[in-house]
Amino acid sequence: MSERETRGANEAIDFNDELRNRREKLAALRQQGVAFPNDFRRDHTSDQLHEEFDAKDNQELESLNIEVSVAGRMMTRRIMGKASFVTLQDVGGRIQLYVARDSLPEGVYNDQFKKWDLGDIIGARGTLFKTQTGELSIHCTELRLLTKALRPLPDKFHGLQDQEVRYRQRYLDLIANDKSRQTFVVRSKILAAIRQFMVARGFMEVETPMMQVIPGGASARPFITHHNALDLDMYLRIAPELYLKRLVVGGFERVFEINRNFRNEGISVRHNPEFTMMELYMAYADYHDLIELTESLFRTLAQEVLGTTKVTYGEHVFDFGKPFEKLTMREAIKKYRPETDMADLDNFDAAKALAESIGITVEKSWGLGRIVTEIFDEVAEAHLIQPTFITEYPAEVSPLARRNDVNPEITDRFEFFIGGREIGNGFSELNDAEDQAERFQEQVNAKAAGDDEAMFYDEDYVTALEYGLPPTAGLGIGIDRMIMLFTNSHTIRDVILFPAMRPQK
């Protein structure tokens, strides 16, 4: 047996011994009465204590004689004979407990407290003071074990480094890593701020079906399920777009939804099959209005959640206080591949040859517009580091967007990029029912030619358009990618609490 194998075997033995020891302690607790009490109440969290009392010195705290109660997980313990120091962690952070034998009821210190384990959840009551080093602490007069932890914290809780464990057992990650906890706190704040931003501008939050008979609103491969009572195959939605625009037809002129979409695609640092999107639709607006709204949204979120319009992501700093760059798709191709002959982008054969020369495999179902878009993706997208709007997307890759009045081969559409990745997609909506029917048919033809991501024909949506959709603009923003930016996270798994993972064998 190698040294590594020997060490691993010894660690397994130690773990099993500790597990058995903790279960024996729980068995003893059961014999004594209620093993999992639920009658302890706290009056402060750790962050509330720090915010309210950190500025006071020890003399002032002693004169005030402030009694508080807290509860949380015991993360560290230093036993020094008749007294100990404990670090207690709760939702707000950490607070130090000073536990002295003579300050507790008889027997509590030696017979109970010293037998507890790291990871146990405890309640404490006592008076506030500051140590000689100035650390706010609680001099405990009452200690109670509220939940016995049967499993030891990993690595004595010096940190959880195994990425697979972090994602599979997110509860351990949240216990172990301050950054992970803060990431999801920021996520929650951003979602709340988005809702406040939208409602303040007259938008109504709605909910639309997660299971659909016809998946629409995006080009993607859907998940399929079966409704037993209806004996009907259904699809987890890939986007809420068509239902939201039905609501605009019905008279709700400004609507938005923040919810999950599902796409049966690969997993990467940028992609999770289950992800969160915000989509919004506003009547009597065009894509220029959406560009202004998007800039304002990101600027507001940065200022309100982070306290600054400057956001650091890796080695880059994004200043959302400045106007964002705007380029057409063709301008971006020329900027990042200067040798491109722009005339090649107007001819199918020339564009196909150009695409193949830079490593793109051109599918039979692709037209000129799709090829130009793929060229843009290959040569320009990774360079769009600072906030940038790309406009003038080909109609072929924009089946739901309004055609441009001057050039019907392109649409009044933009995509929004930061850090070399797409964050949002918006456009003036196609509200010509006959044009929409033709584009749906083109998508059906593409699907028949082998494009698995082409859209289905949605007859009811065409019917809705026939009743009249007012001039409307719509925007979708990937919330997970947005959170990655605001938390300086470099994989989408770091911002989704429970990301998709291959089952362990």
Curated annotation (Swiss-Prot):
It is an enzyme of class 6 (ligase). The modification N6-acetyllysine is found at residues 114, 156. Its cofactor is Mg(2+). Binds 3 Mg(2+) ions per subunit. PROSITE patterns: AA_TRNA_LIGASE_II (PS50862). Keywords: Acetylation, Aminoacyl-tRNA synthetase, ATP-binding, Cytoplasm, Ligase, Magnesium, Metal-binding, Nucleotide-binding, Protein biosynthesis. GO terms for biological process: lysyl-tRNA aminoacylation. Its main location: cytoplasm. Pfam families: tRNA-synt_2 (PF00152), tRNA_anti-codon (PF01336). Mg(2+) 2 binds at residue 422. Belongs to the class-II aminoacyl-tRNA synthetase family. This is Lysine--tRNA ligase, heat inducible. It comes from Escherichia coli O6:H1 (strain CFT073 / ATCC 700928 / UPEC). The lineage of its organism: Bacteria, Pseudomonadati, Pseudomonadota, Gammaproteobacteria, Enterobacterales. The gene is lysU.
